[in-house]
């Protein structure tokens, strides 16, 4: 049974641990070095932006908005030394799973549509492109499914 309450606040530790797991898994798979570290100014901005959305009172709409911001804002502001897109994808998926949903997407290296959207976000220097965020939100909305944990 899925709760009506949303796990709302995203904390730095949640994102940092996700980034470390992503990078260590990548290092194990490829043998490439893992550059683990946080750019604090960017992290502060990411957390502020993520935690200031998702307050409409409509659970599905709020979950979609928060997941979109987790993935989009991490990609845009680059709070980590490495692995920002991968961390955004995994963190958005974990957030949705914690709230009773799953994000059903192909691995990033096979997913040209997602890669294109995230590249557009990353290339914005001064402001977060709201049109691209709408595209990302639509992309995510088409891939959210109810999550039933195995018993």
Protein language model features and the residues they cover:
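FIC/Doc superfamily catalytic core
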Residues: 1-151
């Amino acid at each position: 049974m899925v709760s009506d309450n949303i796990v709302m606040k995203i904390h730095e530790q949640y994102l940092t641990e996700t980034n470390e797991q992503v990078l260590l898994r990548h290092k194990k798979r490829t043998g490439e070095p893992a550059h683990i570290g946080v750019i604090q100014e960017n992290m502060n901005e990411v957390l502020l932006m993520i935690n200031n959305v998702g307050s409409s009172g409509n659970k599905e709409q709020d979950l979609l908005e928060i997941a979109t911001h987790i993935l989009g804002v991490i990609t845009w502001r680059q709070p980590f030394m490495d692995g920002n897109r991968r961390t955004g994808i995994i963190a958005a998926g974990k957030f949705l799973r914690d709230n009773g949903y799953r994000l059903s997407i192909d691995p990033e290296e096979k997913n040209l549509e997602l890669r294109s959207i995230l590249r557009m976000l990353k290339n914005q220097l001064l402001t977060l492109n709201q049109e691209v965020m709408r595209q990302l939100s639509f992309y995510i909305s088409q891939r959210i499914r109810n999550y039933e944990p195995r018993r």
